[in-house]
A protein has these predicted regions:
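Loop-to-helix element that buttresses phosphate recognition and phosphoryl-transfer chemistry
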Residues: 1-30, 34, 85-98
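Glycine-rich phosphate-binding loop signature in dinucleotide/nucleotide-binding domains
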Residues: 12-16, 105-112
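Conserved histidine-centered catalytic loops in small-molecule metabolism enzymes
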Residues: 14-48, 74, 152-169
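Short, active-site-adjacent cap segments at secondary-structure transitions
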Residues: 27-29, 51-53, 122-124
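Active-site catalytic microenvironments for nucleophilic, acid-base chemistry
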Residues: 34, 38, 104, 129-133
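Phosphate-handling substructures
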Residues: 38-99, 140
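Acidic, low-complexity terminal tails and accessory targeting/binding regions
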Residues: 52-66, 107-112, 128-169
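Short basic (Lys/Arg) and small-residue
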Residues: 119
Length: 169
């Protein structure tokens, strides 16, 4: 997946990011390190950008859960706020963790162009926050694998999502 995403970037054009911030989990951090090395961009790992912890469901596919825990999965999909994964992180706790990191990188890298490499749940939460959507509607936001969102943060304006890019299938 990393190579596929990297090859989509024009060969004669370097990205204009000044820093990369990433989840420390390998599927994000490995890609961040590869990009950082390729373009000589510093990389910072921040554990607060890790995916929501799925507890007993961790590392299991939806298909597996439909076989073993269909009722709990349906409740989670219907109302993730009140029905977290068994033994997993509650959505309000996830929100506090991610928004703490989000606020910190906005202060730390004020005025700079940052690439944040993270997971689908984190991206959904940040989009939901930027668009001021209720937390209980988090799962309505589609985040395809290896997609990119461009968020513009300007103190004179509300944050806005200005571009969405998906890796071609």
């Amino acid at each position: 997946m990393w190579l596929a995403a990297e090859t989509q970037w024009p060969a004669n054009q370097s990205p204009d990011w000044q820093h990369i911030v990433t989840s420390p989990l390998i599927r994000c951090a490995g890609f961040a390190q590869a990009l950082g090395q390729r373009y000589s961009i510093p990389v910072t790992r921040d554990s607060r950008f890790q995916e929501i912890h799925f507890g007993n469901w961790e590392n299991r596919t939806a298909a597996e859960l439909l076989q073993s825990d269909a009722d709990a999965l349906a409740r989670f999909w219907q109302d993730p706020l009140d029905h977290p994964p068994p033994g997993g992180e509650h959505l309000p706790d996830f929100e506090v963790r991610v928004l703490s990191a989000w606020n910190d990188i906005q202060q730390q890298f004020y005025g700079k162009r940052i690439l944040l490499i993270t997971h689908g749940g984190v991206i959904r939460l940040l989009i939901s926050h930027i668009l001021q959507r209720p937390l209980e509607r988090l799962l309505e936001i589609d985040v395809p694998l290896a997609s990119m969102r461009h968020v513009c943060i300007d103190p004179a304006q509300s944050p806005r999502i200005t571009h969405i890019w998906n890796l071609p299938a």
